[in-house]
Amino acid sequence: MLKLFSAFRKDKIWDFDGGIHPPEMKTQSNGTPLRQVPLAPRFVIPLKQHIGAEGELCVSVGDRVLRGQALTRGRGRMLPVHAPTSGTVIAIAPHSTAHPSALAELSVIIDADGEDRWIEREGWSDYRAHSREALIERIHQYGVAGLGGAGFPTGVKLQGGGDKITTLIINAAECEPYITADDRLMQDCAAQIVEGIRILAHILQPREVLIGIEDNKPQAISMLRAVLADAHDISLRVIPTKYPSGGAKQLTQILTGKQVPHGGRSSDIGVLMQNVGTAYAVKRAVVDGEPITERVVTLTGEAVSRPGNVWARLGTPVRHLLNDAGFCPSADQMVIMGGPLMGFPLPWLDVPVVKITNCLLAPSVTEMGAPQEEKSCIRCSACADACPADLLPQQLYWFSKGQQHDKATAHHIADCIECGACAWVCPSNIPLVQYFRQEKAEINAIRLEEKRAAEAKARFEARQARLEREKAARLARHKSAAVQPAAKDQDAIAAALARVKEKQAQATQPVVIQAGSLPDNSAVIAAREARKAQARAKQAAHPVADSAISGGDPRKAAVEAAIARAKARKQEQQAGSEPAEPVDPRKAAVEAAIARAKARKQEQQAGSEPAEPVDPRKAAVEAAIARAKARKQEQQAGGEPAEPVDPRKAAVEAAIARAKARKQEQQAGSEPAEPADPRKAAVAAAIARVQAKKAAQQQVVNED
């Protein structure tokens, strides 16, 4: 009973929800064998023909290349591309590619030389002698990708499966209308396909290998059964024709009864799926040593006179293939890359064939029908009934139209396979698939921006953390350097600080020399000043013999004598037994220098200007004022009360001054006035000003 149940389950197939049955339109192209197309004069090979990043260029403009020569290097998910024929690289530049908007992508442009020479090919006929890793690396470096439409790198897919794969499924359903590339390939190359399947099974080591094919391909089924007649490791499952039974999740459910979870992959349930065209490319890469440089493309539609399936070199312009098929375009001719439900119209025909190009449909106007106006959704739920992914297309439509990305994501818009079944059954002619494609593109753009922002935030936070660590390390170093010394070192440090403070205090105090202290130079300084005063008095008393001066000035002599006598008395008092007040030698030196400079200046001015007439009365008054100021300075300069003035000396001095004044008046009245000595007058005035300033400074010092 258990064996009977196992046998029943072995051949059992399941069904999936939804699906439609559109006209197949396959007989236009599946009746003729595969044929070759003449080489195009120029090939455009986009660097990115797969899911993932483009490879690194390894050719330059002007290089000569051979068929099968690598144009890029593949690392990780970067799949290399190869030259489709021999020729010369004439440009490496952006070119419009197979995209609904014909976006420009970096491409290598090759001018064919017509020789179509291959590189040296090295096949592994005994592939079982090579390791799993070596086989995967060879498949990857030979540019094999999923040829069923997704374009995922086959080597990466095999590497990611690992030991989790229990079921290998070969997708031979080819459910979309018009497309017969896989059907014709199975009819003409069934043995090579089965050999490629065995290579995949050798790499994955699954428990079972299943081939799923729709029952509308009787010739292909017959060819596969003939090849698999003696095989027990591969099972052929014929399934009912229903669109989209060729979808990966749908075919998995049909053959195994398992459903791929939302947001998951088929490998999560132990299933890995490959297309029959991919299996054929694996065989050519491993056994024949040929990179993928061509694929089968269906040329169909009522606008071509020779529909069929051809071996199209990758990079061949679409226009070249259609012209070979007898393309007769109408006024508003449309050319669709892919099928009528999942394909997209080409903006122009200069785009190249790539690895995921399986069909070029050129329908007539009557074949496609007139475009109908889009109307409002009537919420009939026909789209939900037809959806094979169990989604709610009408809700996704509202979310997409309203830019409600969060709600669209919550309703699993990412699980939409864009099969077009919802748009096919919509009575309002709403292009639902276009809305869903745009919404998924916007969500992907938002996620990419969020990823970039998160990476930038992570970099910023890492930098901040690094700066904080460096700051903490600096603080720790400073703290360790500022550790208090031991107790035995405290006394030495305190003594050193005391010495430093004492030196600073001594440096800030003015240098003052007290009388009687050692060394005491006050007496010497006073004697020197007295001698200088006596010399000046004698010089003033005896006129200088000069040819330009006729005689002395009695008024000036009187003034200078009085000043000299006052200074002499001051010097006597300072040189006496009483202690003298402190003398600041720096101030004395400064004042003496100022006096000498002013005297020299006055002499220079007196020598250049004419002397003014001298008034004897004014001279007497000035002499008296000078004597009074001198006595006042003596009183202020002393630290004790001023000594009493000798009246006799004062009387004598006054009498002498009066006599000199009368004599000068008489001489001035009886004889013509002689010209005054300008130099002596200037010197006397300078001395008077200096002494007055000195007295004022001394008074300020005493007050302080």
Swiss-Prot record:
Q: What GO annotations for molecular function exist for this entry? A: 4 iron, 4 sulfur cluster binding; electron transfer activity; metal ion binding
**Keyword line:** 4Fe-4S, Cell inner membrane, Cell membrane, Electron transport, Iron, Iron-sulfur, Membrane, Metal-binding, Repeat, Translocase, Transport
Q: How is the cofactor bound?
A: Binds 2 [4Fe-4S] clusters per subunit.
How the protein sits in the membrane? Peripheral membrane protein
Q: Where in the cell is it found?
A: Cell inner membrane
The residues listed in the UniProt record as binding [4Fe-4S] cluster 1, with positions renumbered to this chain, are C377, C380, C383, C426
Q: Does the keyword Isomerase apply?
A: no
Annotated NCBIfam families: PRK05035.1, rnfC
> What protein am I looking at?
Ion-translocating oxidoreductase complex subunit C
Q: Which organism is it from?
A: Salmonella enteritidis PT4 (strain P125109)
This protein's gene is called rsxC
